[in-house]
A protein has these predicted regions:
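Bacterial Sec-dependent N-terminal signal peptides
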Residues: 2-5, 16-44, 171, 210, ...
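Short coil/turn connectors between adjacent alpha-helices in alpha-solenoid helical repeat scaffolds
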Residues: 123-127, 200-205, 249-259, 426-427
Length: 530
């Protein structure tokens, strides 16, 4: 398959205008009943609307990179799901810094953000816009609706599969909301369509809801690797459960490491395989070269899904200084994103000659950072590119073709190993070691980087997660799970806004509910200490 499925988001955007264009935050319902009634009468529209749900991770509005945005009150490119998620997951950590002084962007490094932060508000709005979109599709594909809309018997099973996928996408989005914000507004397809004030759900209760949803839809999803590229299958359900269980102690106070082993094992043995090249997973044709490893990816195309967010942001923003933008398949660098020396130190050889995951640009760059606003301070990261695996340019030098892996098999290898080391049962350290060394053999090209059982410990796993998964939206969650995101046990350059790094209060492990949401909904209470 090509990216044909996700291209349908262009068509879906036009149809979804009546369904969803009025949603700018949670209290505005994205439903126009008359439009819904007409669109859902024709089953030929259903797949295009489903594509719009998947496209919620990629596109930002109805007409392209700018104009008619889904989210108001912020630059449209900045409102991108992936861009917002990356900034909230990576900028407060050792993996990424950014040189721009746009609004409150530097507050992520300083870790002194407030409930009035525009970037946090935009991500909150994006999450609940996506949830509202999913809710409407789920409502319209219930059995009674399918019957009243006259959907033919031959199409019912397909409609139910589409519905299960929409429920998965809603669960994934709620997972991100739970991880970032903790206690959030809670709306499902069973809630009334008319205006009302949603109740707030606790983090632990939301965890239980997502878990129930995933287990309920598991058998309704396509088998692992049986769906089109860009669409979710059973392995995605298992992977999200494994991720939740690995972090369950943070979310609920109760560890679930045995369950993390169970579900990561399901993914690992499901038929997905590690891609042959690490570097190719982040290039313009990764949808072709790396689909054996990508459980689910946000699809991007330089012609059909243009946005200033997503991987367009990740490629352009990481190019600056003496770097040649053309070598990354783009027409310009935005001179923003780099990394800290603390992250660089995870690699014993930063040249990439041994561990090929060490993808740094050092020419003209200082290893240490004195001024965040100076691009040449801090090594640049060359992981993301709009060049293909064969060296050709992507289809557009402004908007990139590179897909963003929301879930990939390597994470499950790391999840299994960590859960075993944390005391989960049903796995073995021998198998865990094999899974870790499989990643390292790909990275090194041979067995020279393999570790022994004596070297396999929790500290190593955190470092290996950094080496394997950096700039893919995992680091904040990982550091929180290890108790290192706040406090003084681990500091990195500009943690807490200090060049040498400093301790940060524990309440920063979740973000505040935006002030605008609190004002709009009297049922919401602010997270503690905000």
């Amino acid at each position: 398959m090509t990216k044909k499925f996700i291209y349908q988001v262009v068509l879906a955007g036009a149809m979804a205008w009546g369904l969803a264009s009025c949603t700018k935050d949670l209290d505005r319902t994205p439903i126009t009943e008359a439009t819904s009634a007409s669109v859902y009468k024709d089953f030929a529209n259903y797949k295009a609307i489903l594509a719009k749900l998947y496209g919620g991770f990629s596109v930002t509005g109805q007409v392209g990179p700018t104009g008619s945005p889904d989210i108001s009150g912020i630059d449209e490119g900045t409102s991108s799901y992936i861009r917002g998620y990356f900034q909230m997951q990576e900028l407060p950590t050792d993996e990424a810094v950014i040189g721009w002084n746009d609004g409150t962007l530097q507050d992520f490094h300083q870790m002194d953000w407030t409930a009035d932060d525009n970037f946090i508000n935009a991500m909150f709005s994006r999450l609940f816009y996506q949830i509202a979109q999913c809710n409407e599709f789920i409502r319209q594909t219930a059995d009674d609706k399918l019957s009243s809309n006259g959907i033919a018997e031959k199409d019912l099973e397909t409609a139910r599969t589409f519905r299960a996928e929409a429920r998965f996408l809603r669960a994934l989005t709620y997972y991100h909301a739970m991880d970032l914000f903790g206690n959030v507004p809670f709306v499902t397809d069973s809630n009334q369509v008319a205006f009302y004030f949603p109740d707030q759900i606790s983090r632990a209760d939301l965890f239980a809801y997502i878990e129930r949803e995933l287990k309920d839809i598991e058998t309704q999803m396509a088998d692992a690797r049986a769906n089109e590229y860009g669409r979710a299958d059973k392995a995605c359900v298992w992977a999200l459960l494994a991720k939740m269980y690995l972090n369950a102690e943070v979310y609920t106070g109760t560890d679930r490491y045995t369950d993390a082993i169970t579900y990561s094992s399901k993914v690992i043995t499901s038929g997905y395989t590690l891609a042959g090249s690490y570097a190719n997973m982040f290039k313009a044709d990764n949808g072709s070269t790396s689909r054996s490893e990508f459980l689910l990816a946000a699809s991007f195309d330089g012609v059909r899904t243009q946005t200033y967010g997503g991987t367009t942001y990740l490629v352009h923003a990481a190019v600056g200084g003496s770097m040649n933008a053309a070598e990354f398949g783009v027409n310009s660098g935005w001179g923003g994103l780099r990394t800290t020396s603390a992250f660089v130190n995870l690699f014993s050889d930063i040249s990439g000659a041994t561990d090929k995951r060490a993808m740094f640009y050092t020419s003209g760059q200082n290893r240490e950072i004195a001024d965040l606003g100076t691009f040449t301070e801090g090594y640049a990261i060359t992981k993301w590119s709009n060049k293909t695996s064969g060296g050709a340019d992507g289809s557009n030098s402004t908007f990139v073709d590179t897909d963003y892996p929301l879930m990939r098999l390597a994470e499950m290898h790391l999840t299994y190993a960590e859960a075993v080391l944390r005391g989960g049962t049903g796995g073995s350290t021998t198998t865990a070691l094999d899974y870790i060394n499989a990643l390292r053999e790909r990275a090194y090209g041979n067995t020279s980087g393999n570790i022994t059982a004596a070297e396999l410990n929790l500290k190593f796993i955190l470092e290996e997660r950094g080496r394997e998964l950096y700039w893919e939206g995992h680091r904040r969650t990982d550091l929180i799970r290890y108790g290192l995101f706040t406090g003084s046990t681990y500091v990195w350059p500009f943690k807490g806004g200090v060049a040498a790094g400093t301790a940060v209060a524990d309440f920063r492990t979740i973000y505040p509910i935006p002030t605008s949401a609190l004002v709009a909904n009297p049922n919401l209470k602010q997270n503690e200490d905000y």
